[in-house]
Regions:
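Acidic, surface-exposed loops and disordered segments
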Residues: 1-123
Length: 123
């Protein structure tokens, strides 16, 4: 069975969800999982060079990490992040966007999965 997921940060009614939360819980995003009624469409994705300093001479793990990061869901599918290879480490920066810090965390996780590196890769 194939499932789809979607996360939403700005376009939902928080009052309807708060009734299911404890008073000390903080709501950041909502994630929906399920089998879609229709499969929607693919969103346009940026090129690796638009979100990183990747080049022909970059190590394969960095190229693979950037490719995987481009598949990370971001707010309004804007992909407003920059991954910069500095020596053997990576600097990740969020550009101004709604939910930029949430986006960057998801992007960094996708990069780690694609590159085969762990959290120690980050500057």
């Amino acid at each position: 069975v194939l499932f789809r997921s979607c996360w939403v940060a700005l376009t939902y009614n928080k009052k309807n969800i708060r009734k299911y939360m404890e008073p000390n819980e903080n709501l950041v995003i909502v994630i929906a999982f399920g089998i879609p009624a229709n499969w929607g469409y693919n969103h346009k994705s940026k090129l690796p060079r638009q979100v990183s300093n990747v080049s022909d001479n970059s190590p394969q793990w960095f190229k693979d990490g950037v490719d995987c990061a481009l598949n990370a869901p971001t707010a309004i599918n804007q992909q407003k992040f920059m991954l910069t290879l500095v020596d053997d480490k990576v600097k990740a920066k969020a550009k101004f966007a709604p939910s930029a810090k949430v986006d960057l965390g998801i992007v960094k996780y996708h990069f780690e999965v694609g590159s085969g590196k762990d959290h120690s890769i980050w500057i």
